[in-house]
A protein has these predicted regions:
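C-terminal catalytic "cap/lid" subdomain
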Residues: 3-189
Length: 189
């Protein structure tokens, strides 16, 4: 029952996000990873990339999210948004990944947005990168930043932006111009 309840909660949250995007004029579609993820011992082995590619080609914004997944070793597990994006990025080769959250970007110990984080600047920031305000089984901001820097190292040229999904119109502006100095850019160099 717990697995199904978590799946339901993730899907309901995604529906709220998609509804808000549609209301703001963004043609979004929710694509649940649980429908196609094959996971073994917590690691995604396969994930259908075709629906995401088709959505992008049709001019739709795939609203991807962390979700439950069946796991051949554990029975069930949670796959984070970052794990889903990491898997998809290897096949789809995006120039940018945009990660909307509750804060204006990645915050330093003083609560200020860090405009840019690279592998070289990360060690000084790690002590400030705690977990999230609520329960986050995927590791919080430190894990998000580290995994996205790992992905940008594996995919040279990939840039990632962490920004507030609560600012009206910001997602639309970033979709049109991802170089805008909003939030925090994560890149290998």
């Amino acid at each position: 029952l717990g697995f199904a309840a978590v799946s339901d909660a993730a899907a309901r949250l995604n529906r709220r996000v998609v509804s808000a995007l549609l209301a703001a004029g963004v043609p979004a579609i929710g694509l649940p990873p649980s429908a196609s993820a094959a996971v073994a011992d917590g690691v995604i082995q396969a994930l259908a990339t075709g629906p995401v590619a088709a959505a992008l080609e049709a001019g739709l914004l795939p609203a991807l999210f962390g979700d439950v997944a069946f796991d051949s070793v554990r029975g069930g597990t949670i796959v984070s948004t970052e794990e889903v994006l990491g898997y998809l990025a290897h096949d789809l080769r995006p120039a940018w990944l945009l990660l909307a959250g509750e804060t204006a970007g990645v915050l330093d110990a003083g609560g200020r947005v860090v405009p840019r984080i690279t592998r070289a600047t990360l060690p000084a920031l790690l002590p400030a990168l705690g977990g999230s305000r609520g329960t986050d089984v995927t590791g919080g901001m430190a894990t998000k930043v580290t995994s996205m820097l790992d992905l940008s190292a594996a995919r040279p040229g990939l840039r990632v932006r962490v920004f507030s999904g609560l600012v009206p119109g910001l997602l639309t502006r970033l979709l049109l111009a991802p170089d805008l100095p909003e939030g925090t850019e994560l890149s290998e160099t």
